[in-house]
UniProtKB/Swiss-Prot annotation:
This is tRNA N6-adenosine threonylcarbamoyltransferase. Residues 347-374 are annotated as: Disordered. Belongs to the KAE1 / TsaD family. It comes from Streptomyces avermitilis (strain ATCC 31267 / DSM 46492 / JCM 5070 / NBRC 14893 / NCIMB 12804 / NRRL 8165 / MA-4680). It is an enzyme of class 2 (transferase). Substrate binds at L140, V141, S142, G143, G144, D174, G187, D191, N283. Binds 1 Fe(2+) ion per subunit. Its EC number is 2.3.1.234. It holds the Pfam family TsaD. HAMAP family: TsaD.
Length: 374
């Protein structure tokens, strides 16, 4: 077995939405996962406000990097690379992270790796369950994405199988939570109420499940509208809305479609491993139904612990470490944020394949043990 010190030591920065995440990994071992969330600042607006998120990232970036280095017990000088989410995500939020990573990598004389947010959500599973089997089918569900992806090489070959044609699953959870006056974010609170409700109480529609519908695409807009109208009709009639039953029935409609299509994709492609990631993967019913259906189909299910399902820097560091380990080219210094970066680009390599440490200057200045560059 190789010495763990030979495994890449990588720091990852995540700012695609409202979490400022900084993670540090050595190979597939998680050393630090520091997060500063601005979710409370967005709650009063009922959703993420891009400008608020960007400003929060600016304020949290340096303290979060410092916290991660301290938690990991490593020196910045010993890092083998800096990875950062280059997209997709909110443009302004991404720009804060990319700018910070570029400055930090250049100052340290370390290679920079701009990586894909969705590919990072897949790769984070390695920190919990070891190397990803190749190929692996991945179901990624969050407030911004609902995608089925086939990964044969997480650093270079990720193929989209299906995606939502309208709203993401997480967005639907947030919307229904608002209609039920349960607050933001909606996923955790719906999950909580649903545990005490009857998932068969109300027959809500399952989008794109007909014989002529796309096999792997999702649609949650119709479901969202149907649930909202059902609630409004109850209120208009002066009747009490059964919040727990509505939550359970709505949640069941979402996870039924997600798991059904994911298992079908595995069967059709002959893939015996399914990984589920993204914020909605923390949902207890999604995990339970996926396990049940995967066992019945002879498919191995891999789901990271809930904290690693939501946005974090550890997942970015994990993918960055994989890039280093496989000898992938570092990004150029003109790396920019791309809010619509396709998942077919797991990372953004440099045109000339130049690494940070070849620029010929020593920019490492140790000021104190708390200094970012020490």
């Amino acid at each position: 077995m190789a010495d763990s010190r030979d495994e890449p030591l990588v720091l990852g920065i995540e700012t695609s939405c409202d979490e400022t995440g900084v993670g540090i990994v050595r190979g597939t071992t998680l050393l630090a996962d520091a997060i500063a969330s601005s979710v409370d600042e967005h709650a009063r607006f009922g959703g993420v406000v891009p400008e608020v998120a960007s400003r929060a990232h600016l304020e949290a970036m340096v303290p979060t990097i410092q916290r991660a280095l301290k938690e990991a017990g490593v020196s910045a000088k010993d890092l083998d690379g800096i990875a950062v989410t280059a997209g997709p995500g909110l443009a302004g939020a991404l720009l804060v992270g990319v700018s910070a990573a570029k400055a930090y990598a250049y100052a340290l004389g370390k290679p920079l790796y701009g990586v894909n947010h969705l590919a990072s959500h897949i790769c984070v599973d390695q920190l919990e369950h070891g190397p990803l089997p190749e190929p692996t089918m991945a179901l990624l569900v969050s407030g911004g994405h609902s995608s089925l992806l086939l990964s044969t090489d997480i650093t270079s070959d990720v193929r989209p199988m299906g995606a939502t044609i309208d709203d993401a699953a997480g967005e639907a959870f947030d919307k229904i939570a608002r209609v039920l006056n349960l607050g933001f974010p909606g996923g955790p609170v719906i999950d909580r109420y649903a545990r005490e409700g009857d998932p068969k109480a109300i027959a809500f529609p399952r989008g794109l499940t007909g014989p002529r519908d796309p096999a792997y695409d999702f649609s949650f807009s119709g479901l969202k509208t149907a649930v909202a109208r059902w609630i409004e009709a109850k209120r208009a009639a002066g009747e009490e809305v059964p919040v727990r039953d509505v939550s359970a029935s709505f949640q069941e409609a979402v996870v039924d479609v997600l798991t059904r299509k994911a298992v079908r994709a595995c069967k059709d492609e002959g893939v015996d491993h399914l990984m589920i990631g993204g914020g909605v993967a923390a949902n207890s019913r999604l995990r339970a139904l996926a396990q049940e259906r995967c066992e019945a189909a002879g498919i191995r299910l891999r789901v990271p612990r809930p904290k690693l399902c939501t946005d974090n820097g550890a997942m970015v560091a994990a993918l960055g470490a994989e890039m280093v380990a496989r000898g992938r080219a570092a990004s150029d210094w003109d790396l920019s944020a791309d809010s619509s970066l396709p998942v077919t680009d797991p990372h953004v390599p440099g045109r000339a394949h130049t690494h940070a440490h070849t620029h010929g200057h020593d920019h490492v200045h140790e000021v104190s043990k708390e200094n970012l560059y020490s």
